[in-house]
Amino acid sequence: MSKFDFDSYPNKYGLDYAKYDVKPNEIPLSIADMDFYVAPKIKEALLKRLELGSYGYVYPREDLFNAYNEYYLKMYNFDIKEARKAFSLGVLPSLSSLIKSFSNKWDFISTFTPAYNCFFNEIRNNDRNIFKIPLIYKDNKYSLDLDLVEEAFKKSKIFILCSPHNPTGYIFSKDELITIARLAKKYGVLVISDEIHSPLIKDKSLFTPFLSSCKEAKEVGIVLFSPTKGWNIAGIQTSLVYSFNEAYMDKVDFGLNRDDVGESNFFSSSAAIAALNSLDWLEEVNEYISNNRLFLSSYIHSYISLLKLVDSSSTYLAWINISSLKTDADDFIKVCKEHGLIISSGSIYGDSSFVRINLAVPKSVLTKGLDRLKEAVESL
């Protein structure tokens, strides 16, 4: 029996939630935010912090970094105690800072595509060039072409790895990560591994932290991680930057300070520590999301067979092929909006043949959303 209730949810309409900046009759399955109540330990920790009644400047506490150490040991049997760590406001502020610190204007920065749209933004906003490495799509699955990776690394200064991958949900194998690390060392490429979605895998044995894959990874890699995605605390800005490369971390610390993104807020450490100690909640939310994915797959097969759901065992994001509809994603999401459903166009991630749907919602909400998706398809 479940300890936690994922069928109930707060009413976010009319408030300042980014995902719910929609009309009251619209269902948003777009922005990567959960609709669930947070783990009880998180709420308790925040209330305890709030009750202090004085909210001055704070610094990242040592027990925060200890909590990360314990989390990695419990989840992956990976010891990061000797890794050097830094606090940051978030994965994207960290990424922007690292781009500035480890590359120069108009350098090439490579990443797998389709890609999280903010990767494109951070690269372009810092006056760098994007080198796209397309993932291979076949039979509703993705795979890597490591020859393309090597060609990209010959020209790249930085490689941004999203592991597991957003938006496709692809989980990189240990062997693939080893090859990436060794190619990066061969060509002098820094690997920035964004692992924010890593808690969102039902079978944690499928995930290999990049720096645990091989000794070369520890030499060439910096990891960006945060509990914000896995435990639904994105509004409380907190993240971790860590590496075993001391020279890299010297530049990281300088850059985070230069860009003013290394300051902790009053609630961030408490929320993060409580989240990292809520593995029971994480296990149950992954089970719930997995069941939602199975429901989505069955619904599409039964009622919207023109759509194809990409096979995935990670994240709470569904990547759906709409190429049989004879329309592109930008036009299709407009039709969905007319039917009261808000979803994300694949064009912003680099592939207009797909849409992305958020599954981290109560099943009742997902069911209503899928009914509207069906209506949108039937209206074409």
Per-range role (PLM):
Residues 44-48, 215, 219-290:
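Conserved core segment of the aminotransferase class I/II
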Residues 326-328, 334-344, 348-380:
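PLP-dependent enzyme catalytic core of the Aspartate aminotransferase-like
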Residues 55-182, 198-200, 207-212:
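Conserved core of the PLP fold type I
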Residues 269, 273, 289-297, 309-322, ...:
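Conserved glycine-rich beta-strand-loop-beta hairpin in the small C-terminal domain of fold type I
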